[in-house]
Amino acid sequence: MQSLAWQPLAEGAERAVLYGDPTHAGPFVLRFRTSREIAIPLHWHRHDEHITVLSGPFSLAVNGERDELETGSYVVIPAGAHHSTWYGAGTLIQVNGTGPFESIYVDQPH
């Protein structure tokens, strides 16, 4: 077993690839962790996104309905569903999906 190689995403957020390559077709497993509060604006993905909350505060709004998810929670966000996410300091989530994994932001031209 290897230790995770964490890569910075934004100030206070990091990502590690556990399995696969999210930039190519096929299954992948990622982990995201935060050291401060972070909000990800409204976006969607071309494939289903499976999220497991491993620790810390995490909330999710899918198609306008916001839910606070507790440690151990699991949710599937269907492909094409518009959603926003909020991470508290110390949050750790795992994302399973099928690549290529791309976030398409609603307020940006694509």
Describe these PLM feature segments.
Residues M1-G26, Q108-H110:
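A short, N-terminal "cap"/entry segment at the start of jelly-roll beta-barrel domains
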Residues D21, R33-S35, V53, P78, ...:
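A short, compositionally biased micro-patch
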Residues A25-H45, P78-G80:
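Conserved short histidine dyad/triad with adjacent acidic residue
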Residues E37, F58, N63-H82:
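Short acidic-glycine-tyrosine-enriched beta hairpin
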